[in-house]
């Protein structure tokens, strides 16, 4: 796949990730119902995606700028992140002076990376990201100055979507902390030696494993990379090169393929006299060399060039293919020089234990002589995990940094010593092939002796212990690996949160659909049952129709056959039968009869519906008129619920009942302020006799207690209770008047049912004998004034005694309704 296609796929991948992050934030925080803070993984993912888009394709600094940055980093004055280009360099071009001062004044932000991240989060908080993106993308000439042609922001089609996505985030209320030291990325200052030693002693095993994994991933990168040769001499091409063959077992190959490439820390190592004394002579000068190792060390700070070749394939003798590295030395002033190299070895205890199980013990090698070929490969049992013990070599190559483990060729060492670790001193574990010529060999460490943990720490008594430089490199590699794992963990967690939300939405949608389906099924079942009942009714009706048609058929045949049997002379004649005509006539007659019956049935159904509607309307009218009659004339004698079910008996009972009406039309307030009380006017009419009585509430209560003793059914009547406070309120008095009127009407109906003598001859005297409550005697002290009578008479003109009375007909008049 070409580089253009790779860049296009990368841009599309960044766009999809950014769209997904924006969508997740809109789903979670849309509508400003909840504040979006940086504690939420969705907001963190959104910021990370915007940073990746703006960081993509930034031009890197070249030449002396890169060299100066690398020297600052190696000296511990700057972190690696400051040598990388950041989008803050371009963003600050469009910011005003006050905005720049604002971001430079942040207390906890001390790097350009942190200022860029703080600007992005501030733009999200203030809903100004859309405006900034329009400003950033407006000037294409300025963009080309800071970004490569294949950068995301240089793609007009995709970059035009950035302001649109930023506008979609305006509905979210962000509250992100911009003055946070975590935005700086890595620490600005290099860690001290005491801090490094303290951290290393806490978890040495984990530290060594992480660092060795980083080195092994570096070897895979170097193996996969193409060969590079810079300033190589023609004489060096003819020199024999040492080839190290590494045989990887099937399990180790699978493990290598599964591992993801890791980012390797790039640090330039500058040697001094103390390092020379502690590490010893690693590379020996061959006879004829005109320069010392110290002179070469001084020159190595000026230019250090290496040529790597990665040949693959089987050997000429048919053995298994091996990955080999060939390193040509640099010739200075016509003479071969030697670099001053830092080569350390770290043995991983866990890796050694696993190698004992997988690879087994490794046999020793014979000591090669001058007649043996220097390209003799290692034994085939060497596993990939054995290379985890190699320490990285820092080499500055152009504007890229590479780590590479080597050991000097030409050093001494016994052949029978195990390939344990590559040491800088004169220890017996160094396995070096002496061979004249400026070249280096790369060898792997077998699972040999396990070094104790104490040997990994700096100690004056143990010359093979780790130095501060080794520990610093291992810890930095471990920290980089830790950052990578944390970033990967955050991205996976963001994806997991998104999938969980998606699955929850799907589950909710499924539940909703299930409820809808259940409701539809219930409606369908009800409809099917109704249709089944209707079908049964139609079947019964069809049977009736068929029976009626058959009956008509039999009657028609009898009527047609009998007259034709006799002619005029009285002789019996047999008519000629035509089967075809008879069948047609029968069929047509059946059809006519069936149509007539169907029409009759339809008319009956329509007539029935019309009668039902008319009956309902009449019932409503009767109920309304009855209520109006009760309001105008008082209660109708008797209760319909107490009448007989037989309609004839019910009519007889109603016609023979006594017509007694009771009202409480008004209430009067008597007495003075302290002793005021209400008097209720009770109007009674029995046929043509009418009179009024005036009673207080206490008298109604006494009547109720007496009737309870005489008629137990009276207990079920609704009698208004006594009220001590607020009993003179107008609304309360009106409500009590209605309740007392209903109560008296119920009592009169009960008396009519219980006393047949009164029902036979309803008169005033009989009623007053049964119930002295209705005696027309004004209580002492409650005599009404003359002014009160005319008022009552004016409200009820027909109820006044002095009013001339007309003769009432027995039949009810229209005015009575």
Curated annotation (Swiss-Prot):
PX domain residues: 658-781
Ranges of Low complexity composition bias in the record: 445-460
Q: What protein am I looking at? A: Sorting nexin-29
Gene name of the encoded protein:
SNX29
Residue ranges constituting the RUN domain according to the UniProt record: 37-181
Q: What Pfam family is a match for this entry? A: PX
Region Disordered, as annotated, extends over 271-299, 344-381, 417-460, 784-817
Which intervals of the chain form a coiled coil?
466-546
Q: Could you list this entry's UniProt keywords, alphabetically sorted.
A: Coiled coil, Phosphoprotein
Statement: the UniProt record of this protein carries the keyword Coiled coil: yes
- Does this UniProt record's set of keywords contain Phosphoprotein? yes
Named from the GO MF annotations, one term is: phosphatidylinositol binding
